[in-house]
């Protein structure tokens, strides 16, 4: 069967390519999935589209936030033919998907039929935010500063706020602060951030500072803004080189007794285990409930839904038009 896929060919260049997918002789851990929608994961994909991340070569097939229906499957796939599923794979109209033996590997989860498939493309963003929130020690009345109000930053801030914490979001892009407020975040600032944090924390620093940018200088801001015995959550993935004297940062961690927490998403089990529900399955259930109940209005995150052939302009907008561009979703139904 014919499949179309997004391919990054050079810095800032991408196009839609095609290939033939063999759909016969499926292994037990394989499935043929027809994609309906997929979301561009801006942080990860822009790092490759514009060569921010080092150590890879073009061409590259980006993407991992996919929603589609199973056409055929092997016996070990925990979903049925015809089921709507969220799965990890590069952007493509048709995918021969395979599980792996790693801690998580490629992920596939059955979606409830009342979940909007367009909104479900944001599932990975929810899973990242949920794991980050759950890794921190939270108490009622805690004050939280979330640095970076991209998609994951906004979701993380809203989740902390739902737990009853006082949360402030920080981003230099005014449009992102405005969007966060539209989605229900009470406090978001794009300038005079130190003054805002001092006012919120009575000058003592926040209990939890979250880096949702992956930018090393912002991690230093987190260390400076957190109180003594506070927590710094590294939710973004650092990719860009940054030269600095590390001693001041290490001194802050040491002198303030700060707990620094790494929050890479792929570190918890996929399935629930006896005595613990700290798993992707449980976070997936929570994310579906948040979407279903409109506790978090995912649609407001999505700037536009486009034909995948317009992929090059999509990456350009996400990189250079941050004020008006947030999440972008590909519509694959015509392919």
Tell me the role of every PLM-derived stretch.
Residues 128, 152, 176:
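Hydrophobic/small residue at the entry helix of a nucleotide-binding pocket
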Residues 226-228:
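Helix-to-beta-strand junctions that scaffold the AdoMet/dcAdoMet cofactor pocket
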Residues 146-149, 161-221:
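Adenosine-nucleotide cofactor-binding segment
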Residues 143, 230-231, 259:
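Short glycine-centered segments of the SAM/dcSAM-binding site in methyltransferase folds
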Residues 23-40, 49-91:
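Glycine-rich beta-strand-centered segment in the early N-terminal region that forms part
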Residues 247-302:
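C-terminal substrate-binding/catalytic core of Rossmann-like NAD(P)-dependent dehydrogenases/reductases
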Residues 203, 233, 242-243, 289, ...:
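C-terminal capping/lid region of NAD(P)-dependent oxidoreductase domains
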Residues 84-147:
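NAD(P)H dinucleotide-binding glycine-rich loop of Rossmann-like/cofactor-binding domains
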């Amino acid at each position: 069967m014919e499949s179309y896929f997004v391919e990054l060919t050079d810095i800032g260049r991408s196009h839609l390519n095609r290939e033939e997918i063999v759909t016969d002789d499926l292994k037990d851990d394989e499935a043929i999935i027809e994609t309906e929608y997929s979301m561009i994961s801006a942080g990860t994909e822009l790092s490759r589209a514009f060569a921010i991340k080092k150590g890879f070569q073009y061409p590259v097939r980006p993407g991992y936030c996919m929603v589609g229906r199973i056409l055929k499957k092997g016996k070990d796939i925990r979903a049925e033919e015809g089921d709507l599923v969220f799965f990890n794979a590069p952007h493509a109209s048709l995918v021969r998907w395979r599980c792996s033996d790693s801690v998580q590997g490629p992920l596939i989860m059955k979606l409830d039929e009342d979940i909007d498939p367009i909104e479900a493309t944001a599932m990975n963003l929810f899973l990242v935010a949920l794991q980050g929130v759950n890794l921190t020690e939270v108490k009622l009345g805690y004050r939280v500063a979330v640095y970076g109000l991209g998609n994951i930053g906004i979701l993380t801030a809203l989740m902390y706020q739902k737990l009853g914490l006082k949360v402030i979001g920080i981003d230099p892009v005014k449009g992102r602060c405005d969007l966060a407020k539209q989605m229900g975040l009470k406090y978001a600032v794009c300038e005079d951030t130190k003054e805002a944090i001092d006012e919120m924390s009575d000058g003592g620093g926040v209990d939890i500072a979250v880096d949702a940018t992956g930018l090393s200088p912002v991690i230093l801001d987190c260390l400076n803004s957190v109180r003594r015995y506070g927590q710094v959550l590294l939710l973004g993935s650092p990719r860009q080189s940054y030269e600095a004297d590390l001693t001041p940062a290490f001194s802050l961690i040491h002198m303030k007794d700060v707990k620094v927490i790494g929050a890479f998403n792929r570190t918890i089990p996929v399935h629930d285990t006896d005595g613990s529900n700290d798993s992707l399955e449980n976070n997936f259930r929570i994310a579906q409930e948040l979407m279903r109940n409109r506790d978090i209005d995912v649609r407001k995150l999505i700037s536009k839904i486009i034909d995948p052939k317009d992929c090059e302009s999509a990456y350009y907008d996400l990189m250079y038009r941050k004020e008006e561009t947030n999440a972008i979703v590909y519509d694959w139904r015509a392919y």
